[in-house]
Amino acid sequence: MFDTRKKIYVSDVTLRDGMHAVRHQYSLADAERIARALDEAGVDSIEVAHGDGLQGSSFNYGFGAHTDLEWIERVAATVRRAKIATLLLPGIGTVHDLKNANAAGASVVRVATHCTEADISQQHIEYARKLGMDTVGFLMMSHMTTPTALAVEAKKMESYGAQCIYVVDSGGAMNMYDIADRFKALKDVLDPSTQTGMHAHHNLSLGVANSIVALEYGCDRIDASLTGMGAGAGNAPLEVFIAAVDRMGLKHGCDVRKLIDAAEEIVRPLQERPVRVDRETLALGYAGVYSSFLRHTEAAAHKYGLDAFEILVELGRRRMVGGQEDMIVDVALDMMSRKPQGTMRDVISH
């Protein structure tokens, strides 16, 4: 059941996940304009970082137009009400980077690991709590493990000090039943004081629906982005999600019209590749592939004269996870030397 008295914590990710859609090339002026619009529209937090988190700017993931600290400082100087969040992947970002991000203005951190690797988040979660940050555990590619196993990992993050645990559908591969099962499993083991969050991707066009189902099962925080700006087919489109929950009578604290205008007038014109469900982004959701693989895969397909869809299907068959972007070229080279075996149906295993 929905609690119409409870306010949804609206977490915008346009300036972090949305980085993937522009190959991490937001200008500082872009960041300022987007942040101001979001702040005025009433979101609770604005996540700011390279698409792959603090220190993600690299040959493997793509170099950013600016440093994380430059983006964070500009946004922190712009907003008047919203909190500044950032993302950290252990092994890419360090506690030193987290300390600097906090000093630059970030008061919320989401510590992200693969859904079966919560163990590697302990140092970073504990350090974030020492800094006094709102500390979130972020279990990526949550479709790749069972609800019960995911709950075990969530409990680990809680034991390290995380105040909120996210179900993260990085591949946009889950449906409403998958989401319900995972939130029920988390609620069964987490302390009632520990919040939960939902990070959806729209590769199967279920980003908004999955976010609403998460709310039905007690979710506290919802990630979304203007126009869905994000990896793959994007995240749950913020303006659509808020319009939908507004019609349901749920409390969100946002100005629907301001979000719609910001999406159309500020963010959509920045899309160099339309953020939408199409052949390649649908392949991500169908095959359960990490959404940020999209642009890297399209580049490899162009370079080697291959079909991006088939590369993505093969990546799904091999169960590649976030951080294995370097394997995209390996897969492409393998496909050049032999005809892919199996069918698309071989990719899916529920």
UniProtKB/Swiss-Prot annotation:
- Site annotation Transition state stabilizer: residues: 16
Carries keyword Heme? Answer: no
Active site (UniProt): 20
What is catalysed by this protein? (S)-4-hydroxy-2-oxopentanoate = acetaldehyde + pyruvate
Q: Entry's InterPro entries?
A: 2-IPM_HCS-like, 4OH_2_O-val_aldolase, Aldolase_TIM, DmpG_comm, DRE_TIM_HOA, PYR_CT
The enzyme's first-digit EC class, named in words, is lyase
Pathway as given in its UniProt record: Aromatic compound metabolism; p-cumate degradation; acetaldehyde and pyruvate from p-cumate: step 7/7
Q: Which residues bind Mn(2+)?
A: 17, 199, 201
Q: Which UniProt keywords apply?
A: Aromatic hydrocarbons catabolism, Lyase, Manganese, Metal-binding
The protein's job, in short, is: Catalyzes the retro-aldol cleavage of 4-hydroxy-2-oxopentanoate to pyruvate and acetaldehyde. Is involved in the meta-cleavage pathway for the degradation of p-cumate.
**Family the UniProt entry places it in:** Belongs to the 4-hydroxy-2-oxovalerate aldolase family.
PANTHER family xref list = 2-ISOPROPYLMALATE SYNTHASE 1, CHLOROPLASTIC-RELATED, HOMOCITRATE SYNTHASE-RELATED
What's the protein called, per UniProt?
4-hydroxy-2-oxovalerate aldolase 2
The species this protein was found in: Pseudomonas putida (strain ATCC 700007 / DSM 6899 / JCM 31910 / BCRC 17059 / LMG 24140 / F1)
Origin organism lineage: Bacteria, Pseudomonadati, Pseudomonadota, Gammaproteobacteria, Pseudomonadales
Underlying gene: cmtG
